[in-house]
Swiss-Prot record:
Source organism (scientific name): Thermoanaerobacter pseudethanolicus (strain ATCC 33223 / 39E)
The keyword Secreted is annotated on this UniProt entry: no
Gene3D superfamilies per UniProt: 1.10.286.20, DNA helicase RuvA subunit, C-terminal domain, Elongation factor Ts, dimerisation domain
Name listed for the protein in its UniProt record: Elongation factor Ts
Task performed by this protein: Associates with the EF-Tu.GDP complex and induces the exchange of GDP to GTP. It remains bound to the aminoacyl-tRNA.EF-Tu.GTP complex up to the GTP hydrolysis stage on the ribosome.
Higher taxonomy: Bacteria, Bacillati, Bacillota, Clostridia, Thermoanaerobacterales
């Protein structure tokens, strides 16, 4: 039986996708170093090595949800215009647009969440835990657990991939990096929803 902790460690060490890590560990009978070799042989451990390389080519793409209710504009960068023009890269960018439209992330990664937002969220979560009657000595642990949930809901890279909840968007990104052999960066996005921020008034 392969533990979730082993899969997580292998993923952190290689940058490969979660399912690829699990398969490699099963193939290696749980041997971490052997699993790393398996991933390297398959070219799936390359993502981490490419992360430091400059990515200034790429695409700006748009997605409009049927009915014109939601629109997304996203910029995704890669290293060369050759890769930017491949169907694989274009499909990846389109998938990211659709993910943003469906899952409504606020940030790309947890590092992008402003400290003030985190502090406010912690205050609210702490008050909730205390109001639920949780003991003071476990409140901090509960709050940190809920902050992790906040990251998974609001940070694009940590969200479950809409087409395969077994993967995160980060897994999808790393798999695409491994396939295309270049660093890929989701640079920025904006999401519009019709009527968002407009106060509606009802006539009695």
């Amino acid at each position: 039986m392969i533990s979730a902790q082993a899969v997580k460690e292998l993923r952190e060490r290689t940058g490969a996708g979660m399912m690829d890590c699990k398969k490699a560990l099963m193939e290696a009978n749980g041997d971490m170093e052997k699993a790393i070799d398996i991933l390297r042989e398959k070219g799936l451990a390359a993502a981490a090595k490419k992360a430091g390389r400059v990515a200034n080519e790429g695409l700006v793409d748009a997605y409009i949800h049927s009915g014109g209710r939601i629109g997304v504009l996203v910029e995704v960068n890669c290293e060369t215009d050759f890769v930017a023009n491949t169907d694989e890269f274009k499909n990846f960018v389109k998938e990211i647009c659709m993910q943003i439209a469906a899952a409504n992330p606020k940030y790309i990664s947890r590092e992008d969440v402003p400290q003030a937002v985190l502090e406010k969220e912690r205050e609210i979560l702490k008050a909730q835990a205390l109001n639920e009657g949780k003991p003071q000595n476990v409140v901090d642990r509960i709050v940190e657990g809920r902050i992790e949930k906040f990251y998974k809901e609001n940070c694009l890279l940590e969200q479950e991939y809409i087409r395969d909840p077994e993967k995160t968007v980060k897994d999808l990104l790393n798999e695409t990096i491994a396939k295309l052999g270049e660093n890929i960066v989701i640079r920025r996005f904006v999401r519009f929803e019709r009527g968002e921020g407009i106060e509606t008034s009802s006539n009695e």
